[in-house]
Amino acid sequence: MERLIIKGGNHLSGEIDCSGAKNAGLPILASTILLDDSAFIGNLPHLQDITTKLELLNSMGSNINFHEDGFIEINSSNIILPEARYELVKTMRASILVMGPLVAKYGKAKISQPGGCDIDTRPIDFHLAGLEQMGAKINSDSKYIYLEANKLNPIDFDFPKVSVTGTENLMMAATLIDGVTVLRNCAKEPEVVELANYLNSCGAKIEGVGESNISITGVSNLKSNRWNILLASVNSLSPGEVLELKVIRSDEQLDLKLVTKERPNTPQAL
């Protein structure tokens, strides 16, 4: 279809429901691995990547329940298989985000290498370099990356290049490390800020988020909080998430109202 012809003349008004941002939801789902109890996440978009992430968590042993109020309950306190299998990782690069939380909480992770490529040609070298500096032992073969750590240590790490998922992975891992971790040249995207805000609502101590340098003071555990995912913005949407129509009127003003669920102002212990 080359064009749309719109014949006006009627006043436009109404409400639309805006779903949460996929790129904010994916790391928050991964971060639920860090919690000691159930996480309650709302306003998740109905997209394949979100479904795949939930399938990945479920395959590792997380218990997932869908509530009538739209919230998804995820309990990852007793993961029995800290592994991201190929059939799930190959469809979504963000599956790599379970690596940091798994090593921090369970001391090990087995992550499939999409396409069977070598470790030093993968675009996750910043993740691995940071985790190795924290004390993780890393090995690999043609199919998997293996990480083990009896104890992770705080680090001062400078990303050679800005990495959104790298920032998220190391930030999540650092939340449970005793001491202060400093990450430099961090990504500043809204989804990074949203992840830090969620973790802080669960008891983490993350400062400087949204700036180049982030400081994380480790805590012994994280507790659940009800959380609605950040609204999707035009700048952060992936193709296919929304169709944007630009309407130009010369005689009247067009008002659009965005409707979403209210986010609690204070943490709610569950």
Description of each model-found segment:
Residues M1-A232:
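Structural preference for solvent-exposed beta-strand-turn elements
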Residues K223, L230-L270:
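C-terminal recognition in membrane/secretory proteostasis and scaffolding
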